[in-house]
Amino acid sequence: WKDEGVMLDLKSDQVAWADGNAWAPCIEEKMVDGKYKYFFYFSGNPVAGGGKQIGVAVADSPIGPFKDLGHPIITESPVGHGQQIDVDVFTDPVSGKSYLYWGNGYMAGAELNEDMLSIKENTLTVLTPKGGSLKDYAFREAAYVFYRNGLYYFMWSVDDTGSPNYHVAYGTSKSPLGPIKVAKKPVVLIQDPAKEIYGPAHNAVLQIPGTDEWYIVYHRINKNFIDREKGPGVHREVCIDRMEFNPDGTIRKVVPFYSSVFSVSRLFPLPSASIVQT
């Protein structure tokens, strides 16, 4: 890994409308007007006060420099409550269209305009899966969308980010804007106290290009920080595990491990005599 430095500082004048806290961001590569651009979406604390709002900054390189649009692109909840956080962007491989998803206490989605800097207001859709409980699929936050074999998979996190019970559930749709059909066995990833694995959620998904090999990336609470009152504070660690599908397209429950799921050379084959420093 190489530290490329700060890509965007919300405490500086780089983002005039916000005062700190680039919360739960995501980045998307998209060709615009014949040139690849990198779009960094984030939730910031508005200078004027109130709840978080979603902004976007743009660069010609994934390491920046990024330039903020100058104003937020999502300012209010479409349902009158919840927070405008946990943004995700999905580009549909079928249509080439890009979609923005966000929300805490609700899930919203909308098609992005071709410039990737605003949404098509008439496409804004509330997608919140109905029902469920904290034991299974009651929606809290962290929507994530991917496509496989004609289905759009919607994943989300259940319970609170600081809870050992924080976990991942999912559903599917025939459209990137729903409606979502919750899976019969919706829980994909959940705590395993016997292995001292707690709060595994707020995930993303990776597909090895050209294969049907998939991985789920998420964070979980370090076992020594599970008691926030007695412990030194929240400490989360980034993890990755293999994610597999049944023949009918349903996702098999992920079994989290402490050991590595693959090596660097497994993903990116190295020429002979190459050395990887870790």
What label would you give each PLM region?
Residues W1-T278:
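Carbohydrate-active catalytic/glycan-binding domains of CAZyme proteins
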